[in-house]
UniProtKB/Swiss-Prot annotation:
<comment type="similarity">
    <text>Belongs to the universal ribosomal protein uS15 family.</text>
</comment>
<dbReference type="GO" id="GO:0022627">
    <property type="term" value="C:cytosolic small ribosomal subunit"/>
</dbReference>
<keyword id="KW-0689">Ribosomal protein</keyword>
<dbReference type="GO" id="GO:0003735">
    <property type="term" value="F:structural constituent of ribosome"/>
</dbReference>
<protein>
    <recommendedName>
        <fullName>Small ribosomal subunit protein uS15</fullName>
    </recommendedName>
</protein>
<comment type="subunit">
    <text>Component of the small ribosomal subunit.</text>
</comment>
<dbReference type="GO" id="GO:0006412">
    <property type="term" value="P:translation"/>
</dbReference>
<keyword id="KW-0687">Ribonucleoprotein</keyword>
<dbReference type="GO" id="GO:0005730">
    <property type="term" value="C:nucleolus"/>
</dbReference>
<dbReference type="InterPro" id="IPR009068">
    <property type="entry name" value="uS15_NS1_RNA-bd_sf"/>
</dbReference>
<dbReference type="InterPro" id="IPR012606">
    <property type="entry name" value="Ribosomal_uS15_N"/>
</dbReference>
<dbReference type="Pfam" id="PF08069">
    <property type="entry name" value="Ribosomal_S13_N"/>
</dbReference>
<dbReference type="GO" id="GO:0070181">
    <property type="term" value="F:small ribosomal subunit rRNA binding"/>
</dbReference>
<dbReference type="Pfam" id="PF00312">
    <property type="entry name" value="Ribosomal_S15"/>
</dbReference>
<dbReference type="InterPro" id="IPR023029">
    <property type="entry name" value="Ribosomal_uS15_arc_euk"/>
</dbReference>
<keyword id="KW-0963">Cytoplasm</keyword>
<dbReference type="InterPro" id="IPR000589">
    <property type="entry name" value="Ribosomal_uS15"/>
</dbReference>
């Protein structure tokens, strides 16, 4: 996928495994993988961090092939899903960091401009999640309360 506010084409991406079946050497069952997901989610890890740990430590290439569901769906069924979607959370976290930087460096014009771009991405993503009913329709990003969202 291309970049929104940069000239890069963004062609690089990871390739999915060709076979969608569970590898024969994988000894974990669907229930074992789900238990691992619950355990890692209770530690406070995000769905993508859980996927990386399962891939690197347990040899689960794609959770969906083993369990039949994606990590976020498994977490939602148990009520362990994060309140904010992960990509929106990280954008808000980045905006808070840039705002904190601007408090110390008021004349940093480039940071001011980048903050505008980050916040426009936040608004665009929030609009998307409102139409998908992931966020409530009255949810609004405000820079004054943003640090409380990511704390």
């Amino acid at each position: 996928m291309g970049r929104m506010h940069a000239p890069g084409k963004g062609l690089s991406q990871s390739a999915l495994p060709y076979r969608r079946s569970v590898p024969t050497w994988l000894k974990l069952t669907s229930d074992d993988v789900k238990e691992q997901i619950y355990k890692l989610a209770k530690k406070g890890l995000t769905p993508s961090q859980i996927g990386v740990i399962l891939r690197d430590s347990h040899g689960v290439a794609q959770v969906r092939f083993v369990t039949g569901n994606k990590i976020l769906r498994i977490l939602k069924s148990k009520g362990l899903a994060p309140d904010l979607p992960e990509d929106l959370y990280h954008l808000i976290k980045k905006a808070v960091a840039v705002r904190k930087h601007l408090e110390r460096n008021r004349k940093d014009k480039d940071a001011k401009f980048r903050l505008i771009l980050i916040e426009s991405r936040i608004h665009r993503l929030a609009r998307y999640y409102k139409t998908r009913r992931v966020l409530p329709p009255n949810w609004k990003y405000e820079s004054s309360t943003a640090s409380a969202l990511v704390a």
